[in-house]
UniProtKB/Swiss-Prot annotation:
InterPro entries: Anamorsin, CIAPIN1. This is Anamorsin homolog. Residues 219-233 are annotated as: Fe-S binding site B. The keyword Iron applies. Monomer. A motif (Cx2C motif 2) lies at residues 230-233. [2Fe-2S] cluster binds at C181, C190, C193, C195. Residues 133-171 are annotated as: Linker. The C-terminal domain binds 2 Fe-S clusters but is otherwise mostly in an intrinsically disordered conformation. The N-terminal domain has structural similarity with S-adenosyl-L-methionine-dependent methyltransferases, but does not bind S-adenosyl-L-methionine. It is required for correct assembly of the 2 Fe-S clusters. [4Fe-4S] cluster binds at C219, C222, C230, C233. Its cofactor is [2Fe-2S] cluster; [4Fe-4S] cluster. Keywords: 2Fe-2S, 4Fe-4S, Cytoplasm, Iron, Iron-sulfur, Metal-binding, Mitochondrion.
Length: 257
């Protein structure tokens, strides 16, 4: 046999309470059930948890709506129905929000001023396994080798021969690498140079000397020192001179007095 709980506010006068009870019983649609009236906290405590198939209450404001939803959530069985009779729009909105926050589902508002909902068919703390991608913590060496092999096979399709990118001009003008001479901190030609570094240094010195002899200053500040020389000046790093390179400027330290 079904158990119906009728929640009536304890501060309602007796005639009004009887009217509310008739309204709540009418919501049960005449079902053959045992009716339990809840008019106080003691009545609510006497009712066992999850023992009701339906719970009906009347709410005059938001606080009564929240109290009714809290009691119904405790006393209703899974799948049980809750119906709350409201008087105005504000209370109806508050009741709807209270039902949702209490975890009820299928919240509907009827034209007769009753807000109905259903207690979900699961219990608190119910576990549910979610499908997720399994993480392989202990992968075998064979799996790792297969992964690297697949990666290498994919890379082979996109490899380009680097030699094919060089033109004939690039090959002919490639710099000569000298491997036989390594003296001191810097590389220079050794005494018995056989790798060609000595000849390259001699040719570079001759080229530098020839450029200095034929050099014509564009700014006219080459003799003044690095502070006045341009970025491409061949005399960068050399001391200031008078007219010809190599002629150092000497300061007269004599006493004029």
């Amino acid at each position: 046999m079904s158990v119906l709980a009728l929640d009536v506010a304890r501060d309602v006068a007796a005639p009004r309470r009887a009217e509310i009870l008739e309204t709540l019983r009418a919501l049960a649609d005449g079902a053959d059930a045992t009716t339990r009236e809840i008019a106080s906290d003691d009545d609510a405590d006497a009712l066992e948890r999850a023992s009701c198939d339906a719970y009906f209450a009347r709410a005059r404001d938001a606080s009564e709506a929240r109290r009714a939803c809290a009691r119904a959530s405790e006393k209703l069985r899974a799948g049980g129905a809750l119906g709350v009779v409201v008087d105005d729009e504000r209370t109806a909105t508050a009741t709807t929000e209270a039902m949702v926050l209490a975890g009820f589902t299928t919240v509907t508002r009827e034209d007769d001023g009753v807000v109905r909902c259903v207690k979900p068919n699961w219990a608190r703390g119910t576990a549910f396994a979610l499908k997720s991608r399994a993480v392989r913590v202990n992968a075998t060496a064979a799996d790792a080798a297969d992964a690297w092999g697949a990666s290498a096979a994919a890379d082979d399709d996109e490899l380009i021969d680097e030699s094919a990118l060089l033109t004939e001009l690039d090959v002919n003008t490639a710099p000569v690498k000298y491997d036989d001479c390594d003296v001191g901190a810097g590389k220079k030609a050794c005494k018995n140079c056989t790798c060609g570094r000595a000849e390259a240094e001699a040719a570079e010195e001759a080229t530098t000397a020839a450029s200095e002899e034929t050099f014509v200053s564009a700014c006219g500040n080459c003799a003044l020192g690095d502070a006045f020389r341009c970025a491409g000046c061949p005399y960068l790093g050399q001391p200031a001179f008078k007219d010809q390179p190599g002629t150092k400027v000497e300061l007269d330290l004599g006493d004029d007095l």
